[in-house]
Amino acid sequence: MRQPGGGRVDVLLDGASVLDSPLSLLSPALEAAHLFFDSPANARHRIEIRTLSSGKVRILGIVAERIAPGVVYDVLGVNGARASRILGWNQPALAEVLAARKPDLIVLEYGTNEITDAGWTPTSYQRLLAGILRRLHEAAPQASLLLIGPPDRSDLAIAADKMSSMIVAQRRAANAAGAAFWSSYDAMGGAEAMNVWTGQGLGQADHVHLTRAGYNRLADYFYQDLTLAFGNAAPNRRRNPTLDRP
């Protein structure tokens, strides 16, 4: 990232610089910087980033891709995440990064942490999510958007109607923004489902997070609903599909 007080760096691939001259990260304002270079395929490589001055250096990420058909999955997992945090990010830089990556699909999953926030209301939450989805659409108009709702949790005395209100707010926000919506909560079985899943070894002892087997089960449910939504699979009679297409 270029920024005030930014330093200079060199980038090396297998010990050799990929630059004709050092890269300056100095800029009057924060802005994303991108560097692209090729490497021989089907081999291991070592990438080094060396600072050449005492200036600030911030690396937002490294992407290694093959020029071949397939799926590239970029993941950004943040502990204690809330949708509102997106609004605190540098919006021009976020837009630049999304424009450079050109995603075909952007997936957001929120709700587990917000459900315990004091003063939470369905109306304000729906408005927040709809605004975030619109911003992402403006930054990456070619991308489809998918909002995933939270799984059930049974560690706190959260009324089932409050969780249901959150799912309704998320579904309405997705519909308003032309995004798809999938409910983990409903896929699990709704209220008190976490107790059942934990008893089956699918939920962790905190009754908030799933085990590896639980997340695999939920992923299978999502895949079933996704293929059903596109007419490529027969419905699972044991479950009701929970994916809303835009």
Regions found by a protein language model. Give the residues of each.
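Short C-terminal domain-edge/linker segments immediately following a structured domain
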Residues: 27-32, 79-80, 103-109, 137-141, ...
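Catalytic His-Asp segment of secreted/periplasmic serine-dependent ester chemistry enzymes
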Residues: 91, 151-246
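Residue-level recognition of the N-termini of beta-strands and the immediately preceding loop/turn
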Residues: 71, 143-145
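Generic detector of short alpha-helix boundary/capping microenvironments
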Residues: 37, 50, 137, 162, ...
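Conserved SGNH/GDSL esterase-like catalytic core that processes O-acyl groups on lipids
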Residues: 1-131, 209
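Extracellular/periplasmic catalytic domains that process cell-envelope and extracellular macromolecules
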Residues: 40-42, 99-100, 139-140, 174-176, ...
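Conserved N-terminal glycine/acidic-rich loop preference
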Residues: 102-115, 123-139, 146-184
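A generic secondary-structure signal
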Residues: 96-97, 135, 225
